[in-house]
């Protein structure tokens, strides 16, 4: 086999050598013919000059030269020329090796070895053809500048090429080395980038020639620099230094670099074949544009980011800044550039240099929304979205020019691209503190149109835009019920239920699906969070919406299971649950069946009994002690705190019933344990506060369940948080939970120190970030008042925690009437216990101090009338919804601020006229306050055990604090 291979290789080598020898002979023959042609041309020059430029045949000299040039370009035609004497010349050869297009010869050999294996060898022989082209170049005299004399020399000039650019040669242009061109193609393609492009070297194969300029073609065909040979007489058609270009009077189009257009950038384009319809150049200027090439149409993507991720709006700026900036977050314009890569509008810098370009005026853009061509409408809407980005002035003018109805009408357009871009513009226009745009969108039917688009859209980007727009609109109070009326069912069944992972009829064999934290889900949950704060009717509609509560709880359970509790979607879901839990003991169907007897006013009966015992001359103290010990003993015996007698259910709870089931306590405690999102912590504590309020059976179960699930340590731990709203929500929740006597004892024993510490921070915070707002201080004082009422042990705990000095100092120094009034009530309650007066007097406190504390300041700073009252009365402030202010079924939340109830995000309840920080849906994503510390991570916070007591073989005591 090896001999066969060697033989084949040798035969191939011999064949190649034979071909080379043949080519060499052919080359010599061609060189000889070249010499003959050169001599003939030299002889033809002399008679032509003497006979007025005519050759022997009578042809004009330029025509004869042109024929000679054409003959020289065609190898094989030179043999017809006469032999002429030789003359001095410079020979130039160009050899080009090409493969024979014929089928290569293949030799196949098969060898079978001794072991039975077969080996197949195939050898291919490819025939190559070598073409040698030779040309003769005369010596050209040089001028004083060292360059060839192009016009003063012989008529041939530079035989190798057309006229050379003297300026180009003086610059030292190396030029390319190229072979003689045999074919020329006239092209109407694009123009070169500029004169500097000819400095780029290119190399022909095996070339040994002079430096010449690269071939150049244009709209008018080949020019003098295109590699053809042009006689001096023909140079008039190609002026010296001229280049191919468009006709005179028309300038070359600029070549713009891809750059961001404003603050937004977009790299996606819309292909004309994707959308159909005419190809449109998005040119909004009045000048005529030329483009070298027609490419694909453009699609600018509407960014999906929603408005709630925004911080405060920056100051107004021109719509087209000269400098670029990173992608903005709050509301993104959809148009990165009106024209990218192939077709684009001029950049800002080029616009300033080129006066014929200008930006379209806003009325022109709005007029394009009525254009009959769909791509014009789409690009106009995208451009409008870009203009509205963080520009309140443009948004206001769009409304004044009646642009909002045009955009709303485009939401029902048959083409998806038009709908998408119109929705993106509406999202930006609906963002901001100015509610006039939101009202205008409502007046022209924007909410129903958005809901229709959400039902019909299957493109995720369109769904993000629709839900983001609805989120912006939901922050406007008059629009909340409109969104509920038109979009509640669609938002629930199209987004919340599918993305939450909840299934109406789950398959027992399959694993439950996890929630999908998509942008669409985040936007929709944010919208429902806003509308759930509208009022009782809105809460009723959301509670009765089939699948909504089930899906939200399933999503929260999924977040806890995956330990992903800090995202915005979880925050929105918890806030919705908190809002729907508000007044649940009054508003849910059948709540009357679970109502319990109204408890007496705190301290009313017992205070009268104590006053009666105190008035007696004998046995007052003994009677007091007997009453206290007997009452405490009875309280412990009346209820077995180790067991909970929950109502029997024949079927699983669903819908709004899930809101107040004891099982939901475990979910909220898990969120309080795992989450580091302050908004989520506040909402979870607020939900427990709502569920533990009221005088009905389920509130009793909730209070006991919190203790059973060891939730009290979790709440007390959060009192150390330096986030004001978290401390406030936890303090109110502890007050409601203390309505359970056993909870009150535990809270008084273990939480009093933290409560007093917050009172001290109200006067002299340890650091600026620890300062508490008035609402939070009042909430803490209300909780202290609740746990010391009817509990001597808790009052002793207050003394041991050095709470009396803090309360007295607060009354004396506070500028808030509400704070001083709340602190006075606590001091009044403490002084009512005779058992503590001795200790107080030993510490230097007198009765006058407590009297002055309770009577020093009344409403608006006026002295209170009446003498000292040692009865423990609750704080009296503004009532809520006509309820008595001294009732204990609900905490008088008006004492916490202008809101009325803390179940709803207070920012959502503010009127936009007084809210200087923007709407809830337009808040910045939660970021840790650099001045506040997060709750201590790790084991410093007690963990919540989510294990049923039934499954524990040796359960710990229910009242265990650790």
UniProtKB/Swiss-Prot annotation:
Chain span(s) of sequence motif Nuclear localization signal: 608-624
Xref: InterPro entries: ARM-like, ARM-type_fold, Armadillo, Plakophilin/d_Catenin
Region Disordered, residue ranges: 95-123, 233-255, 268-291, 322-357, 593-618, 844-962
Keywords, sorted A to Z: Cell adhesion, Cell junction, Coiled coil, Cytoplasm, Methylation, mRNA processing, mRNA splicing, Nucleus, Phosphoprotein, Repeat
Start and stop residues of the ARM repeats: 350-389, 392-431, 435-469, 470-510, 528-567, 577-623, 647-687, 700-739, 740-782, 783-827
Compartment(s) where it occurs, according to its Swiss-Prot or TrEMBL record: Cell junction, Adherens junction; Nucleus; Cytoplasm
Keyword Ribonucleoprotein assigned: no
GO molecular function: cadherin binding
Composition skew (Acidic residues), residue ranges: 272-282
Pfam families: Arm
Phosphoserine PTM sites in chain numbering: 269, 334, 337, 345, 347, 607, 864, 871
List of residues that carry Omega-N-methylarginine: 171
Regions of compositional bias (Polar residues) in chain numbering: 103-115
SMART domains: ARM
Nucleus keyword on record: yes
Region Required for interaction with RNA-binding proteins DDX5, HNRNPH2 and SRSF1 and with mRNAs, residue ranges: 777-962
Organism superkingdom: Eukaryota
A single Gene Ontology CC term: plasma membrane
Residues annotated with Phosphothreonine modification: 103, 105, 643, 872
Primary localization class, coarse: other
Compositional bias annotation for Basic and acidic residues: 878-887, 920-932
Swiss-Prot/TrEMBL GO biological process terms: calcium-dependent cell-cell adhesion via plasma membrane cell adhesion molecules; mRNA processing; RNA splicing
Quaternary structure and interacting proteins, as annotated: Component of a ribonucleoprotein complex containing mRNAs and RNA-binding proteins including DDX5, HNRNPH2 and SRSF1 as well as ARVCF. Interacts (via the extreme C-terminus) with FRMPD2 (via the PDZ 2 domain). Interacts with CCDC85B.
Similarity comment text for this entry: Belongs to the beta-catenin family.
Its biological purpose: Contributes to the regulation of alternative splicing of pre-mRNAs.
Protein name: Splicing regulator ARVCF
Organism field: Mus musculus
Name of the encoding gene: Arvcf
């Amino acid at each position: 086999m090896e001999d066969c291979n060697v033989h084949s290789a040798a035969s191939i080598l011999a064949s190649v050598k034979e071909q080379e020898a043949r080519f060499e002979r052919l080359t010599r023959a061609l060189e000889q013919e070249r010499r003959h042609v050169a001599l003939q041309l030299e002889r033809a020059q002399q008679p032509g000059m003497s006979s007025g430029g005519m050759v022997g045949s009578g042809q004009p000299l330029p025509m004869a030269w042109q024929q000679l040039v054409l003959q020289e370009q065609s190898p094989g035609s030179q043999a017809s020329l006469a032999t002429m004497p030789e003359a001095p010349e410079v020979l130039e050869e160009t050899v080009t090796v090409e493969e024979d297009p014929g089928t290569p010869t293949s030799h196949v050999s098969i060898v079978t070895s001794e072991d039975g294996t077969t080996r197949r060898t195939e050898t291919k022989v490819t025939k190559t053809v070598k073409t040698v082209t030779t040309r003769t170049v005369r010596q050209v005299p040089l001028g004083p500048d060292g360059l060839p004399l192009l016009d003063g020399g012989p008529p041939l000039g530079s035989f190798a090429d057309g006229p050379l650019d003297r300026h180009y040669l003086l610059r030292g242009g190396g030029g390319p080395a190229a072979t003689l061109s045999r074919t020329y193609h006239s092209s109407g393609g694009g123009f070169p980038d500029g004169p500097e492009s000819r400095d780029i070297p290119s190399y022909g194969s095996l070339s040994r020639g002079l430096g010449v300029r690269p071939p150049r073609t244009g709209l008018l065909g080949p020019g003098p620099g295109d590699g053809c040979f042009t006689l001096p007489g023909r140079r008039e058609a190609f002026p010296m230094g001229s280049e191919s270009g468009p006709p005179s009077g028309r300038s070359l189009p600029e070549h713009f670099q891809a750059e961001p257009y404003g603050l937004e950038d977009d790299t996606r384009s819309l292909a004309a074949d994707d959308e159909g319809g005419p190809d449109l150049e998005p040119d909004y200027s009045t000048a005529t544009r030329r483009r070298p090439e027609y490419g694909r149409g453009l699609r600018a993507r509407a960014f999906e980011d929603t408005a709630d991720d925004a911080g405060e709006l920056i100051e107004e700026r021109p719509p087209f800044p000269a400098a670029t900036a990173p992608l903005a977050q709050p509301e993104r314009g959809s148009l990165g550039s009106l024209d990218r890569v192939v077709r684009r509008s001029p950049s800002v810098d080029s616009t300033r240099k080129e006066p014929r370009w200008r930006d379209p005026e806003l009325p022109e853009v709005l007029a394009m929304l009525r254009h009959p061509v769909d791509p014009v409408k789409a690009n106009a809407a995208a451009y409008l979205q870009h203009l509205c980005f963080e520009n309140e002035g443009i948004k206001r003018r769009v409304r004044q020019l009646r642009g909002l109805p045009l955009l709303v009408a485009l939401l029902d357009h048959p083409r998806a691209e038009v709908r998408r871009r119109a929705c993106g513009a509406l999202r930006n226009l609906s963002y901001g503190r100015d509610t006039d745009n939101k009202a205008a969108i409502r007046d022209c039917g924007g909410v129903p149109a958005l809901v229709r688009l959400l039902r019909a859209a299957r493109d995720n980007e369109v769904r993000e835009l629709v839900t983001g727009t609805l989120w912006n609109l939901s922050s406007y109070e008059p629009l909340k019920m409109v969104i509920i009326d038109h979009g509640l069912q669609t938002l629930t069944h199209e987004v919340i239920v599918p993305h939450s992972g909840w299934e109406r009829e789950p398959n027992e064999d399959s694993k439950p699906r996890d929630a999908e934290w998509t942008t669409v889900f985040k936007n929709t949950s944010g919208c429902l969070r806003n509308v759930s704060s509208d009022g009782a009717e809105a809460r009723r509609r959301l509670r009765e919406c089939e699948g909504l509560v089930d899906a939200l709880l399933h999503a929260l359970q999924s977040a806890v299971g995956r330990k992903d509790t800090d995202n915005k979607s979880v925050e929105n879901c918890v806030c919705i649950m908190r809002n729907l839990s508000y007044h649940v003991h009054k508003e849910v169907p059948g709540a009357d069946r679970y109502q319990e007897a109204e408890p007496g006013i705190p301290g009313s009966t017992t205070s009268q009994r104590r006053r009666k015992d105190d008035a007696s001359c004998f046995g007052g103290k003994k009677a007091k002690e007997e009453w206290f010990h007997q009452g405490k003993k009875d309280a412990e015996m009346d209820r077995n705190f180790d067991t909970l007698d929950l109502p029997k259910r024949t079927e699983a709870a669903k819908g709004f019933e899930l809101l107040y089931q004891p099982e939901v306590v475990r979910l909220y405690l898990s969120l309080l344990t795992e989450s580091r999102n302050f908004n989520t912590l506040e909402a979870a504590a607020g939900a427990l506060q709502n569920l533990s309020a009221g005088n009905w059976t389920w509130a009793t179960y909730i209070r006991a369940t919190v203790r059973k699930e060891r939730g009290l340590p979790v709440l007390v731990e959060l009192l150390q948080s330096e986030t004001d709203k978290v401390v406030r929500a936890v303090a109110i929740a502890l007050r409601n939970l203390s309505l359970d006597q056993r909870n009150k004892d535990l809270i008084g024993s273990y939480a009093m120190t933290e409560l007093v510490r917050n009172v001290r921070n109200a006067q002299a915070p340890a650091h600026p970030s620890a300062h508490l707002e008035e609402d939070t201080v009042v909430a803490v004082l209300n909780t202290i008042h609740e746990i010391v009422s009817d509990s001597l042990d808790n009052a002793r705990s207050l003394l041991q925690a050095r709470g009396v000095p803090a309360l007295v100092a607060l009354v004396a120094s506070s500028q808030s009437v509400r704070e001083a009034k709340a602190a006075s009530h606590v001091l009044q309650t403490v002084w009512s216990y005779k058992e503590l007066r001795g200790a107080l007097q030993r510490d230097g406190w007198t009765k006058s101090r407590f009297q002055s504390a309770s009577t020093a300041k009344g409403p608006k700073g006026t002295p209170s009338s009446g003498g000292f009252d040692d009865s423990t009365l609750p704080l009296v402030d503004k009532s809520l919804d006509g309820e008595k202010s001294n009732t204990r079924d609900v905490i008088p939340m008006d004492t916490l601020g202008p809101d009325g109830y803390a179940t709803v995000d207070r920012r959502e309840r503010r009127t936009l006229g007084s809210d200087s920080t923007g709407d809830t849906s337009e808040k910045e994503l939660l970021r840790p306050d650099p001045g506040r510390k997060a709750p201590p991570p790790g084991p410093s916070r007690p963990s919540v055990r989510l294990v049923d007591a039934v499954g524990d073989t040796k359960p710990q005591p229910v009242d265990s604090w650790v």
